[in-house]
C-alpha cells in the first residue's frame, strides 16, 4: 500500500515537473539532453562533487531542469536502490566513474512524462530503466537520451522493476554463460543473501539446478536460512560449516558443483574452489572481503579448475542493446510467473538518504535500501 500511495502521488505531481539537469551538467550530453524550450523547474537529486565516504560527500540538492527536445525523454523517477556498486562508485573504487559532480545511482525505474519529436520507441506512461551504469537515478526526475533507456513492462511489481537491471541480469548471465549446466546439476555460491545471491537461487530453481548457498554466520542465521530456502535454496551453510567434514554428506545427494559464484574473495573463495568438480569454473563478480582470490597450485593442476570474472557493464559492451533487452524480457517473464521476486527491501524517502546510505553499508543487513521519490 505504501508503494502504491507513493507511486500514485508521484504520478499526480508529474505534470507539474519539467525536464533537464542544470547548466553544470551540460558536458554530459552523452546520457542526458538539455533544452531551453520551457521555463526551468527544480528537482531534487543526490549529488556528490568528489569521491569519499558516501555519508559525507553525498548531498541532497535542487537542480534546474528544462524541457525536452529531439531524442530526449523526460522521466519521473519512481524508485531506485542503493547497490554496492553505487557505494563503490561514490568512493572512487569502481571500473566506471562518471564525471564530477555526478548524481548517484546506477539502477532504478522511472515513468516517461514526455518525449521529444524524434523519439520512436517510448511514449508517455511507459516504465523505463537505465540501459547502462552511471545514469544517475537518485533524483526525482531527469531528461535522458532515448538510447540511455530501456522500456519495460508495467505489469511487474515496482520493487522488482527498480531492482531488475543489475543483480538479476548478473545472476542469469553467470548461470548460463560459463558452464553448460543441465537440470539436476549443482551450483555453489557465497554471499548468498546478497541481491545477486537471492536472484541466483530463484533463477537456478527455475532452471531446475540445485544450489549450495554459503553465508556468514550471524545472530539471526536461522531466520536467514529459512528465508533463502523459501526462495528455493537447496542447502544453506555458514562459511564455518562449509569447512567441516560433515559437509561431504551433501554431495552424496547431488553432484559436485561445476560452477561456483564468488562475491567475497579471500578464504571464502578458496573454500568454493575446494568443492568444485574437476574441470569446474569459479566466476568472481565481487570482492566484499577486499582480499585476493587464492587458488592452490594443486587445485589448478590436478582438478583443472578455471577462474573467470564477470562484470555486467563489460557484457553489455560485448553484446547489442537488443540482446540486453531480450535478457530483460526473459527476467520479466520469470517475475510474472512468480519465479523471481525482488530481494528483501526497505523503502526510504529520498530525503532520508543518509539513513539509507548508512544502512546499506552495515554488516549483516540483508534488506536492500530503496529510495522512493
Curated annotation (Swiss-Prot):
Positions annotated as active site in the UniProt record: 94
Subcellular localization: Mitochondrion
Binding site for NADP(+): 167, 193-196, 216-218, 285-288, 310-312, 368
EC number: 1.3.1.104
Primary location recorded for the protein, binned into one broad class: mitochondrion
Record keyword Protein biosynthesis present: no
Catalysed reactions, as listed in the record: a 2,3-saturated acyl-[ACP] + NADP(+) = a (2E)-enoyl-[ACP] + NADPH + H(+); (2E)-butenoyl-[ACP] + NADPH + H(+) = butanoyl-[ACP] + NADP(+); (2E)-hexenoyl-[ACP] + NADPH + H(+) = hexanoyl-[ACP] + NADP(+); (2E)-octenoyl-[ACP] + NADPH + H(+) = octanoyl-[ACP] + NADP(+)
Keywords linked to the UniProt accession: Acetylation, Fatty acid biosynthesis, Fatty acid metabolism, Lipid biosynthesis, Lipid metabolism, Mitochondrion, NADP, Oxidoreductase, Transit peptide
Disulfide bonds: none
Gene Ontology terms describing biological process: ceramide biosynthetic process; fatty acid biosynthetic process; intracellular iron ion homeostasis
Residue positions, PTM N6-succinyllysine: 61, 252, 267, 316
Keyword flag Lipid metabolism: yes
Phenotype of null mutants: Homozygous deficiency causes placental insufficiency and embryonic lethality between 9.5 and 11.5 dpc.
Functional note: Catalyzes the NADPH-dependent reduction of trans-2-enoyl thioesters in mitochondrial fatty acid synthesis (fatty acid synthesis type II). Fatty acid chain elongation in mitochondria uses acyl carrier protein (ACP) as an acyl group carrier, but the enzyme accepts both ACP and CoA thioesters as substrates in vitro. Displays a preference for medium-chain over short- and long-chain substrates. May provide the octanoyl chain used for lipoic acid biosynthesis, regulating protein lipoylation and mitochondrial respiratory activity particularly in Purkinje cells.
Protein's name according to its UniProt entry: Enoyl-[acyl-carrier-protein] reductase, mitochondrial
Source organism per UniProt: Mus musculus
Organism taxonomic ancestry: Eukaryota, Metazoa, Chordata, Craniata, Vertebrata
Amino acid at each position: 500500500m505504501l508503494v502504491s500511495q507513493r507511486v500514485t502521488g508521484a504520478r499526480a505531481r508529474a505534470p507539474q515537473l519539467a525536464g533537464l539537469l542544470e547548466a553544470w551538467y551540460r558536458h554530459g550530453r552523452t546520457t542526458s539532453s538539455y533544452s531551453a524550450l520551457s521555463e526551468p523547474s527544480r528537482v531534487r537529486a543526490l549529488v556528490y562533487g568528489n569521491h569519499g565516504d558516501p555519508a559525507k560527500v553525498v548531498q541532497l540538492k535542487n537542480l534546474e531542469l528544462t524541457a525536452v527536445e529531439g531524442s530526449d525523454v523526460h522521466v519521473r523517477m519512481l524508485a531506485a536502490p542503493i547497490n554496492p556498486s553505487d557505494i563503490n562508485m561514490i568512493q572512487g573504487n569502481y571500473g566506471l566513474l562518471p564525471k564530477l559532480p555526478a548524481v548517484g545511482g546506477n539502477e532504478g525505474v522511472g515513468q516517461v512524462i514526455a518525449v521529444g519529436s524524434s523519439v520512436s520507441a517510448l511514449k508517455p506512461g511507459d516504465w523505463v530503466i537505465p540501459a547502462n551504469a552511471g545514469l544517475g537515478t537518485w533524483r526525482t526526475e531527469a531528461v535522458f537520451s532515448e538510447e540511455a533507456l530501456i522500456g519495460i513492462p508495467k505489469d511487474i511489481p515496482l520493487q522488482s522493476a527498480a531492482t531488475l537491471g543489475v543483480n538479476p541480469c548478473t545472476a542469469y548471465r553467470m548461470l548460463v554463460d560459463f558452464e553448460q549446466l543441465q537440470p539436476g546439476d549443482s551450483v555453489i555460491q557465497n554471499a548468498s543473501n546478497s541481491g545477486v545471491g537471492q536472484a541466483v537461487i530463484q533463477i537456478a530453481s527455475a532452471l531446475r539446478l540445485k544450489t549450495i548457498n554459503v553465508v556468514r554466520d550471524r545472530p539471526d542465521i536461522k531466520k536467514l536460512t529459512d528465508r533463502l530456502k523459501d526462495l528455493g535454496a537447496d542447502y544453506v551453510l555458514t562459511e564455518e560449516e562449509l569447512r567441516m567434514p560433515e559437509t561431504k554428506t551433501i554431495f552424496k545427494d547431488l553432484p559436485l558443483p561445476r560452477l561456483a559464484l564468488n562475491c567475497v574473495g579471500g578464504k571464502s573463495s578458496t573454500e568454493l574452489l575446494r568443492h568444485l568438480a574437476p574441470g569446474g569454473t569459479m566466476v568472481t563478480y565481487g570482492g566484499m572481503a577486499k582480499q585476493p582470490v587464492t587458488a592452490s597450485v594443486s587445485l589448478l593442476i590436478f582438478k583443472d579448475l578455471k577462474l573467470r570474472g564477470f562484470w555486467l557493464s563489460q557484457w553489455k559492451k560485448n553484446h547489442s542493446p537488443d540482446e540486453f533487452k531480450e535478457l530483460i524480457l526473459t527476467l520479466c517473464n520469470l517475475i510474472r510467473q512468480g519465479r523471481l521476486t525482488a530481494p528483501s527491501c526497505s523503502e526510504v524517502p529520498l530525503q532520508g538518504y543518509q539513513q539509507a546510505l548508512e544502512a546499506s553499508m552495515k554488516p549483516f543487513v540483508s534488506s536492500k535500501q530503496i529510495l522512493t521519490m
